[in-house]
Structure formats: C-alpha cells, structure tokens
Amino acid sequence: MKLPQAFYARDTRTVARALLGKVLVHLDGGVRRAARIVETEAYHGPDDRASHARAGPTPRAAIMFGPPGRAYVYLIYGTSHCMNVVTGPEGFPSAVLIRAAEPIEGCLHSTRGPGNLCRALAIRREHDNGRDLWGEELFIEDAPAPREAVVTGPRVNVGYAGPWAARPWRFALRGSAWVSRPAPAGARAARAPAPAPRPRRPRGSGP
C-alpha cells in the first residue's frame, strides 16, 4: 500500500524516522525498481542553516514550501541526483533526504549514498522533481516497522551550518550494510556485497 499524503504532513524529524524500513519504488519504463529505506536526514524549516530553504523560496527550493508528499529531486555537482520528500504543513519548508536503501529489485547500481540511490532507481530531476508520491510511477510503499534499532547522529557534510551541523537529524537502521559512510555510531554491523565500480559519493548532498 502506498503511503498517503497524511503520512508526510508531520514534523520532518518524525517522518525521517518513520520512513526507515519503507520501500521506495520507481516504475521506470514499466520496470519496477525498489529499495528498502535504511538511512534518512531531516531538514527542518527556514532557520535550518543546512537546508536549501534558508535562502527562501528560490527556484530550486520553492517546492519545499509547497504541500507535503512531493518529491524534491535536485542535481549536485552536475552529475548526481538526490531524492527528498517534502514534509510538514504547506508553507513551512522542510524535507527528508533519502540517503541510502537496501536493494530489493531492479536496481541498476549500488544504493548506498543519495546519488547512488537515485542512479540505481533511475530517479532524475527532469522527470521526477515535483511528483506527488502517491501516483503511479514514483511512490513509497508501507512496510512493517523495522526490527532493527534506529540510531541517530549529525547530518553529513554540513559543517558550514554552524550549530545546526550538530543536530542529530540523521537516522539509520543499526546493522544495515547499506548505510552510507561515515555511518552514525553503532549503525554498521555487516558488510554489503561489493558493488560495481562507481563514482565517489558527492559531498554536501542535503536539501
């Protein structure tokens, strides 16, 4: 069952935790590509200095000010896409970055790290930015609550955000081999299968 809009219309930190264990699905030309979410980051409100919303509703970040349950997909360094979910009440800019997932089916690439995840599921800004997440092509399916414990830590590569850099708004499933590096303390207890060679994960990928 697809998650309804009401799921996303909550505090972004609540949604970031609740998304762990859910299944991100992209129907790419009729091919189902799916992965279980194991790591997220919350970007909360206009005062969050790590968020794109800190500069107001710019052409790139305007979608964060819109209704919840929309995909916010942007390009970094001209090469990698990042998939976010708009959350909270409309007008309060917030989003959850999906940092990593465990591959389930149809994945084209490693799913560890936000750029890799979008590459694996063929999610692209030009096709998917602004989509609602209860449609027919890009959506998140409900799943049982994860058995793994949730660990938290600071978000990745947001040192420029001053005191906001230390907020423990990164969430991951303990023991998942697919959590991106550096993992939150205690998050990694296994090694993922060796992926095919891939570009280095871009830095500073949050919305």
From Swiss-Prot:
UniProt-listed PANTHER family: DNA-3-METHYLADENINE GLYCOSYLASE (PTHR10429:SF0)
Positions with biased composition (Basic residues): 198-207
SUPFAM superfamilies reported in the protein's UniProt record? FMT C-terminal domain-like
Q: Which GO terms describe its biological process?
A: base-excision repair
Q: Where are the transmembrane segments?
A: none
A Pfam match is Pur_DNA_glyco
What organism does the UniProt record list as the source? Anaeromyxobacter dehalogenans (strain 2CP-C)
Q: What is this protein called?
A: Putative 3-methyladenine DNA glycosylase
Q: Which CDD domains match?
A: AAG
Please note every region of biased composition (Low complexity): 182-193
Q: What class of enzyme is it?
A: hydrolase
Query: Which GO molecular function terms does the record list?
Result: alkylbase DNA N-glycosylase activity; DNA binding
- Name the lineage: Bacteria, Pseudomonadati, Myxococcota, Myxococcia, Myxococcales
